[in-house]
Curated annotation (Swiss-Prot):
It holds the Pfam family SAM_1. PANTHER family: ANKYRIN REPEAT AND SAM DOMAIN-CONTAINING PROTEIN 6, SCP160. Residues 593-603 have a biased composition (Pro residues). This is Ankyrin repeat and SAM domain-containing protein 6. Its main location: other. Residues 462-478 have a biased composition (Polar residues). The keyword Nucleotidyltransferase does not apply. SUPFAM superfamilies: Ankyrin repeat, SAM/Pointed domain. ANK repeats lie at residues 1-30, 57-86, 91-120, 124-156, 158-188, 192-221, 226-255, 259-290. The gene is anks6. One of its GO terms (cellular component) is cilium. It comes from Danio rerio (Zebrafish). The keyword Repeat applies.
Length: 739
């Protein structure tokens, strides 16, 4: 039957044999190892016999000795290390139960002293005490009764299921019978601390929930594991009718689980919450908040009336209460002006002589419909004093001067500007748009046009350096698709000092550089077209009021033409020296390093071209013939800044990297492909040095970033131009002069 020799010897009480077997290597609690150790041929242990032995009763030596009351054998086995808590795998019977069934008190005492558990139950739910009761072992019963905590149940109680079993069955009638017979079953808890009401709320049994509530079950009871209530369980499982009933019975919606969630929070965690359920819980939460606020207000009034002292401020914590206070304060404010200037895209400055209206004077709190407005604001000290003395200045109507000062400071700091703009704006000169075709301008006509237009200009306060940038974007876009590499090298009467640095914010962007308008050199002659653009840019600067506060203009000597201004005042944003002529100009652009070396003051002109260029076709031919000398000359507006209109060879010369030009020519890298090169591409081309690669990558990044800025500025400029074109001052052109 699977019993080992050791088990049989212990069953018969043969202690000498048991000791002999143990001394020769028999295992105390393992019948399978006992078979192997004994070498019994009848019960030879192989892989199959081991599995069969596990399926049998697994008769162990201690269990056999305890069942037959062999106290000496039990003591010997325990001394050799047998576990007193060992039990049969199939039935759950322990050695203590077998000893109690046999009625051996001494064996029971030995087992308990060695660690046997008197509360252990078998598969039938019986303890050793119940086994002794059933078999009427009086001595063992008396001994185990004092040490057993699991008390035996009567037979009728065993036959009747508990309330949780009835809830699992969904039998409302059985639940009713149980709670009527024993009222304590209403609030009984299971192992997780859950009550029958919670279980009914989970399953959605509305009838059982109503029955338990009628039997005075605790509606707000929380389980011991998660701290959930019956309302939370019903909400999370979507039992809407149960939620309505529990709310009607006064369930607390403010109770929080151990993770801090309320019933409303749990319903919001659902993927598809019921809209009606959400509204129901939200309305109840709002009513509870209102009731609590009313109770706090009544208690505060009672304390104020009894003590005669001002009540302490109420609890102002939480986002909801803060938002309520702020909304009440802003409801009493009256804004006499709106903050249009901070939200408008119009960059024009206000009228110069308009009175400054501080923001503090635009806000006045009103009490009972009375409006208080003042064109000017008192000093800071006087204003704070007035706020502390009058009720009209208080946002709450209670004279809380400190809070009024804080809210005023918040609005002042959050406003776009410190003062509000005026409604009056001067007419704006529209940005220069090149016509579809140029006429052969002459120097005399340019001078007369300049004199005629200068009489119609008006002084205007400069804005935030945006007037020049508006025209820059249009002129860039007009000349963006055509690239003319020809730039005149020698100084001329028209362009030697008429262009500003590319980083100047006043009017230099209006005529963005010689290379920005190189198409005008080819259409109408470089000298004449440059002079026209210079005059228009100078006219815009005089209209902006910049010519009044700068140094007087120095005219370039020209024996055959009308003198033009050599240098114009400009706003230096990045502390750069103006590039008036080639003798003083050095590349100080912060965008690229190293900068090109300074060029000589005067470069000898070609043999077929005079030193001082006239106008017309001669200037045009000279401008187109000077392609190779463009980047080395710093005259005009060239200041070392890389632009997207520069050719690849010019960019390399500006970077002093002419030695790499054959590499790009050999690989047939054009300007479009150049703008897409990466560090790996440059290494593949053969540029192994880190310094030149970083300079080339910086130039590519600057050109790509400039294209994005031009598109953004173009959109803003077109909008401003369309809005201001109707009100711009129209100046008639002077009569056309022929050669």
């Amino acid at each position: 039957m699977g019993a080992s020799v050791l088990a049989m010897a212990a069953r018969g009480g043969h202690t000498h044999t048991v000791k002999l077997l143990l001394e020769n290597g028999a295992f105390v609690d393992d019948c399978e190892h006992a078979c192997v150790s004994e070498g019994n041929t009848n019960t030879h242990c192989s892989a199959g016999s081991v599995q069969e032995a596990r399926a049998l009763l697994e008769v162990r030596a201690l269990l056999a000795a305890a069942q037959h009351g062999q106290g000496a054998a039990v003591a010997l086995l325990l001394d050799w290390g047998s576990d007193a808590r060992v039990c049969h795998t199939g039935t759950g019977w322990s050695a203590l139960m077998l000893a109690a069934a046999g009625g051996s008190l001494s064996v029971c005492q030995q087992l308990v002293e060695r660690g046997a558990d008197p509360d252990h139950t078998n598969v039938l739910g019986n303890t050793a005490l119940e086994v002794a009761l059933q078999l009427r072992r009086r001595d063992v019963q008396k001994y185990l009764d004092n040490i057993t905590s699991v008390r035996p149940r009567p037979d009728d109680e065993k036959k009747r299921p508990d309330v949780f079993h009835a809830l699992k069955l969904g039998n409302a009638q059985l639940v009713k019978e149980i709670v009527e017979q024993d009222a304590a079953q209403v609030d009984v808890c299971n192992a997780d601390g859950a009550s029958p009401l919670m279980m009914a709320a989970v399953s959605g049994q509305l009838e059982v929930v109503q029955l338990l509530v009628e039997k005075r079950a605790d509606v707000d009871r929380q389980d011991s594991v998660h701290g959930w209530t019956a309302l939370m369980q019903a909400t999370y499982h979507g039992n809407k009718e149960v939620v309505k009933f529990l709310l009607s019975q006064g369930a607390d919606v403010q109770l929080r689980a151990k993770n801090g969630y309320t019933a409303f929070d749990l319903v919001m965690l659902l993927n598809d919450p019921d809209t009606e359920l959400v509204r129901l819980l939200a309305s109840v939460c709002m009513l509870v908040d209102k009731d609590k606020s009313k109770q706090r207000g009544k208690s505060a009034l009672r304390r104020r009336a009894s003590a005669g002292t001002p009540s302490p401020p109420e609890d102002k914590t939480g986002l909801k209460s803060w938002w309520n206070r702020m909304s009440n304060r802003f409801r009493r404010l009256k804004l006499t002006h709106t903050l249009r200037h901070g939200l408008s895209t119009n960059r024009l400055a206000p009228f110069p002589d308009a009175a400054d209206v501080p923001l503090d004077a635009t806000m006045r709190a009103e009490e009972g419909g009375a409006e208080v407005a003042s064109p000017t604001a008192p000093p800071a000290g006087a204003q704070s004093t007035a706020c502390s003395r009058t009720e009209d200045c208080g946002l709450n109507g209670t004279g809380s001067g400190k809070e009024d000062f804080l809210i005023t400071t918040m609005l002042r700091n959050g406003a776009p500007l410190a003062r509000l703009p005026s409604e009056q704006l001067k007419a704006v000169i529209p940005p220069f748009l090149p016509p579809s075709c140029f006429e052969p301008w002459s120097s005399e006509r340019c001078g007369s046009l300049r004199d005629a237009r200068s009489t119609h200009t008006h002084s205007q306060r400069p804005g935030r350096s945006s007037a020049g940038s508006d025209t820059a974007s249009i002129s860039r876009v007009v000349n963006r698709s055509i690239k003319f590499p020809s730039i005149t090298k020698g100084p001329s009467p028209s362009n030697s000092g008429s262009y500003n640095s590319a980083h100047s914010s006043g009017g230099s962007n209006g005529v963005g550089g010689v290379n920005r308008h190189s198409d005008t050199h080819n259409r109408s002659g470089g000298s004449a077209a440059d002079s026209v653009l210079s005059q228009i840019a100078a006219q815009r600067k005089r209209a902006a009021g910049l010519m009044d506060s700068r140094s007087p203009a120095v005219e370039t000597p020209s024996p055959a033409h009308t003198p033009l201004p050599d240098s114009r005042p400009k706003l230096e944003l990045q502390k750069r020296p103006q590039s008036g002529n080639s003798s003083r100009s050095k590349s100080t652009s912060p965008t690229l390093t190293p900068s090109p070396s300074p060029t000589p003051a005067h470069t000898p002109a070609p043999a077929h071209t005079p030193a001082h260029r006239p106008t017309g076709a001669s200037a045009d031919s000279q401008g187109s013939a000077s392609t190779q000398q463009r980047s080395r000359s710093s005259g005009g507006s060239s200041s070392g800044t890389i632009t997207d209109e520069d050719e690849l060879s010019g960019i390399l010369r500006k970077l002093s990297l002419e030695k790499y030009q054959p590499i790009f020519e050999e690989q047939e890298v054009d300007m479009e492909a150049f703008l897409t090169l990466t560090d790996g591409d440059l290494q593949e081309l053969g540029i192994r040095t880190d310094g030149p690669r970083q300079q080339i990558l910086a130039a590519i990044s600057e050109l790509n970033a400039g294209k994005g800025r031009e598109r953004q500025i173009l959109q803003e400029t077109i909008i401003n131009f369309q809005s201001s074109f109707g009100s711009s001052a129209s100046t008639p052109r002077a009569a056309t002069h022929t050669h």
